[in-house]
Amino acid sequence: MKMKVLNVGLVKGRHNLPVEFYVYNEIKDVLDFDALLLGAIKFFKEHSNNNQIEYNLYITGLTPATIAVIRAFSLTANEGDRLTFYHYDREADSFKKQYGFVVGFDSKFNFTYLI
């Protein structure tokens, strides 16, 4: 089975990004951590289809939103799902890849995250 790839921006309208989807259309209060987490969980549940998905997340700042996405991924991901981060490099005018997480199970079926 081929892994589905979703290019995802953190917040719509903040930057011009090479993405099809955004986790958040808007953020009313960047310090409302519960709302951020619920919004990110909603995003992952809407895009999960029990197939392996690689989420390429383009980070645009807003650390609380990024942390909420990581937490939501850890709560909703299916086995084989991946979360990879892309950060903008001003000098190169391109995005730099940072490997994140792959969800899997060990031989005793214990849930694990591989970095």
What are the residue ranges of the model-derived segments?
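Long, low-complexity, Lys/Arg-enriched
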Residues: 1-56, 68-115
